[in-house]
Regions:
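A cross-kingdom marker for long, charged
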Residues: 271-338
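Structured, acidic catalytic/metal-binding patches in enzyme active sites
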Residues: 26-36, 42-286
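N-terminal signal peptide c-region/cleavage motif recognized by signal peptidases
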Residues: 18-20
Length: 338
């Protein structure tokens, strides 16, 4: 329950940041997502003498109809000694709390209460008429049979609508690729697995965690939440073709499409600013810096001890000028980019 509440805020950032700076103007023809067996991007290669670090760049969303062709990655994994996962934030829950069926029921009730508008209000009563009309137009276009009142707060309503629209347009999360990738990694039992993560402690009683969730949702700026809602609508209205183009580019291995676009959570992302200003995530910039430092330390160690290492990063972080690949270059490693 708490994990969902935290991720409901972060989801808006992850979902929308992938399309930041993608809009290239309106196309005369609608972009259709590619299908079939597709390889994704080539691997980046970092060299320290005879030692190699191969990096696989992930992206989300990806085309729903693609089947990831994993042979190239499978060969590298078989010949590697270690895999370094992408930087991540994880949550540490009390096992007893999660297994208690009473708490699961209480959690559903709390989640419903915190994600819905107070006093049984509806979305059209809360947001400006112009914004609601745009929301209703998108909803009617994609889901014409739905006309029941929307009682979710703007952030949640906008995020869920955007997720559903992406699925209707043939776009799905990167799990379509990362799940088979993780199966490949598990199959290679000889691999040392290095996870680079910051763990958020969510231990304690249900009451204490519920208070944290209430504080988080209560600390979100109403003005910033409306701005995030408006941005969600704008991108669903005008950038879906660009999102599909980038998803196709990733699936087919066209790396140049990603050069110069911001890392998810850039300063011009209104949903990220909403998250940053919330009480629970006030130190997110420090967390990101710590994760980057840990990943680079793991890469440095691997490049001095392993003959071959496989690593995973967001493709945007591989192609931006101040990303982790650029940091490896400043350390004097030889870089090969596709």
């Amino acid at each position: 329950m708490i994990r969902w509440l935290l991720s409901s805020v972060a989801c808006a950032t992850a979902l929308l940041a992938a399309s930041t700076a993608m809009s290239q103007g309106n196309n005369a023809l609608e972009v259709v997502t590619v299908t079939g067996r597709l390889p994704g991007p080539p691997l980046w290669r970092v060299s320290n003498g005879d030692r190699r670090l191969y990096i696989f760049g992930t992206f989300s969303p990806v085309p729903d109809g693609m089947i990831w062709e994993s042979d190239r990655v499978a060969r590298v994994l078989e010949g590697s000694q270690e895999v370094i996962f992408a930087p991540d934030i994880d949550a540490d829950f009390s096992l007893g709390l999660m297994l208690n069926p009473v708490n699961l029921f209480r959690g559903r009730r709390l989640s419903k209460r915190l994600t819905r508008l107070p006093d049984d209000a509806t979305l059209d009563e809360i947001v400006p008429a112009e914004l609601y009309d745009r929301y209703a137009a998108l909803r009617s276009r994609y889901f014409p049979r739905e006309d029941d009142p929307v009682r979710e707060r703007p952030l949640v309503a906008g995020t869920r609508l955007a997720e559903r629209i992406q699925r209707e347009e043939g776009l799905v999360s990167s799990k379509q690729v990362t799940k088979p990738l993780n199966r490949l990694i598990k199959r290679n039992r000889h691999l040392q697995q290095t996870r680079v993560e910051v763990v958020v402690s969510l231990k304690g009683s249900f009451t204490s965690l519920a208070r944290r969730a209430e504080t988080l949702m209560g600390s979100l700026s109403p003005e910033k939440e409306l701005a995030c809602f408006a941005e969600q609508l704008r991108r669903m209205e005008s950038e879906l073709d660009a999102m599909k183009s980038r998803a196709n580019a990733w699936a087919q291995g066209y790396v140049d499409e990603f050069r110069g676009i911001p890392l998810p959570g850039s300063d011009d992302d209104t949903c990220f600013l909403l998250l940053l200003e919330s009480s629970e995530f006030s130190t997110i910039e420090q967390v990101r810096s710590e994760l980057d430092a840990r990943w680079l330390a793991a890469a440095d160690r691997a490049l001095t001890t392993n003959e071959s290492t496989f690593a995973i990063l967001d493709i945007v972080d591989l192609t931006r000028e101040d990303g982790l690949l650029a940091a490896l270059r400043t350390r004097g490693y030889e870089i090969w980019e596709p």
